[in-house]
UniProtKB/Swiss-Prot annotation:
Active site (UniProt): 173, 242, 338
Enzyme class: oxidoreductase
Name under which the protein is recorded: UDP-N-acetylenolpyruvoylglucosamine reductase
Documented EC number(s): 1.3.1.98
UniProt organism field: Acinetobacter baumannii (strain AYE)
MF-aspect GO terms: FAD binding; UDP-N-acetylmuramate dehydrogenase activity
One of the GO biological process terms: peptidoglycan biosynthetic process
Cofactor(s) the record lists: FAD
Matching Pfam families: FAD_binding_4, MurB_C
Classification via PANTHER family: UDP-N-ACETYLENOLPYRUVOYLGLUCOSAMINE REDUCTASE (PTHR21071:SF4)
Task of the protein: Cell wall formation.
Amino acid sequence: MFKNRFFNTMQIQNQVQLKPFNTLSLDVTASHYTKVKSIEDIEEALAFAKEHELNVLVLSGGSNMLLPQQINALVIHLDIQGIDVLSEDQDFIRVKVGAGQVWHDFVLYTTKQNWFGLQNLALIPGLVGASPVQNIGAYGVEVGEFIESVQVYDRLLKQTGSISAADCHFSYRHSIFKDDPARYIITHVTFKLLKQANLKLNYGDLKQAVGDNLTAENLQNQVIHIRQSKLPDPKEYPNVGSFFKNPIVNTQEFERLIAQFSTIPHYPQANGNVKIAAGWLIDQAGWKGKQLGVVGMFHKQALVLVNYANASLADVKKTYQAVQHDVEQRFQIMLEPEPVLYNNLGLIENHTE
């Protein structure tokens, strides 16, 4: 019989069901689990993992991960709260936010406070601590544009630290936290937000939806409305949001594509490359609304993979690999999954392995 083990402020639990904690609703059991509310909790959890020779899997909002049925590792569930104003002037406000804050709730809070910049990122699932990891983005805005620094516990140096936005090396769905995922545990994120509205409306149908009501609140509401009209609620249709990254191709590759598919949605990048809409590729490959067993691509948004009925990780992999195959056959583009894949030892695996 397993017993819970208590430390100063933290509790280790055994054989914990993680289905409520991952938005794809995969049936997953963790051999060891703890919820951390402070840096001291993190240090105690890491000491426990070292003592028991366990790998560590850091769980945030569970909205960007693919988990196996059994994880033999210590799952550290982040629950560090707090929204603290550090400083402000007439143009900017600096705010330090706990990694365990719900992202969407934080965005709503900034709008109520008349802090601007994050409204395009409303309704993205997950927690604040996960936002820098893959540099979350939507409707022409990436969170890295408004991050000043990221506060971390450095597992290599065994101490806390702060990493500037420049040193995070933010790019499309990427940061240093993806390059070295086992080193840093994000504890807080410091944002530098605008105090004067500067609405970004140059993406898709957003400008038309906002119309003449050029307020941050209306922009936020329109983003929420558009997302709700296209994207399924994970509580009703378990999913991880956009399942594939929008592929970025060079000029030569784009010229080949546009010559063959003249209506392909595309977005020129600053470096001369071109971003292609993955959802369109999936739709054209015949996968919008199509299922393979209990897993399929959503009928309103082909980019979203849905667990329709108690799918396993094997079911999910079978489906997304079939989508990759069909898209590659038609367009000679290999789609890259966004969510992180873990093995039963709590370690990150490559999707191609």
